[in-house]
């Protein structure tokens, strides 16, 4: 019989030293790449995610273009060296599905109708993964889109919450994601007060779910504040 590993100690401290509501440290480096229209290196704890935006540009193949709006193309990939066990470089079903999930989360904010017959390409490259990469990917993509000057109704801010050792905790790391009882990634759009991605693995009661949702929105608001600060620092120059 294997004993379940304790992930939160009696003092309420998690394996990486955080309290149950604490997020991992976040670092945002805008304009990280020279050849993209917009880019960011987004670090959240051990997660290191590069997002690059190209466009709006002509659509190839031509028949894929839409007469009334731009198409968003999202490619989420994990580098072979991003996980503890080397991952195959071939795209997995998970990566293809997450590319679609992320595109859906972004489609509700990008003003695609301003750029008919064009494509906006968003690349999300996970260089190092430590759980929550889909929501960190959406967070990073919004920053890269803003960096590219693409108009949006709001900025998507993501964070996962979950149930670990019977408690609802914010921003799960890899071991909490794998060994915890539930994992719930969400993406929130503060300017619209709307959620554009919500998934859940595992089991929670209705009460726990309500608590998780409220903690997820609070966490996303903290992420949003950091996104806004990073964009203001780069783009709002104080006149002297
Ligand atoms: O990353 P996210 O939580 O959005 O997606 P997941 O499918 O729930 O994966 C959770 C974590 O498992 C990832 O962030 C990686 O740390 C890890 N993982 C892995 O080690 N190898 C894979 N092929 C896929 C995920």
Please provide the spans of the model-predicted regions:
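Polyanion-binding surfaces on beta-sheet-dominated domains and ring/shell assemblies
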Residues: 1-240
């Amino acid at each position: 019989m294997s004993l379940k590993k304790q992930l939160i100690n009696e003092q309420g401290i998690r394996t990486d030293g955080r309290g149950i509501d604490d997020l991992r440290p976040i670092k945002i480096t805008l304009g990280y790449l020279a050849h993209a229209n917009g880019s960011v290196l987004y670090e959240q704890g051990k997660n290191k995610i590069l997002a690059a935006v190209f466009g709006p540009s002509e659509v190839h193949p031509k028949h894929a273009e839409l007469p009334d709006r731009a198409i968003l193309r999202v490619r989420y990939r994990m580098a072979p060296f991003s996980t503890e066990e080397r991952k195959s470089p071939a795209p997995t079903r998970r990566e293809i599905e997450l590319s679609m999930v992320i595109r859906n989360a972004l489609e509700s904010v990008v003003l695609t109708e301003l750029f008919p017959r064009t494509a906006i390409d968003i690349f999300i490259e996970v260089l190092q993964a430590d759980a929550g990469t889909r929501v960190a990917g959406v967070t990073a993509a919004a920053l890269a889109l803003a960096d590219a000057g693409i108009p949006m109704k709001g900025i998507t801010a993501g964070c996962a919450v979950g149930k670990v050792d019977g408690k609802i905790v914010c921003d799960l790391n890899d071991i909490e994601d794998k060994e915890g009882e539930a994992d719930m990634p969400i993406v929130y759009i503060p300017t619209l007060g709307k959620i554009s991605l919500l998934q859940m693995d595992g089991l929670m009661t209705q009460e726990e779910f309500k608590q998780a949702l409220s903690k997820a929105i609070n966490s996303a608001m903290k992420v949003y504040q950091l996104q806004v600060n990073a964009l203001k620092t780069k783009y709002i120059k104080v006149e002297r």
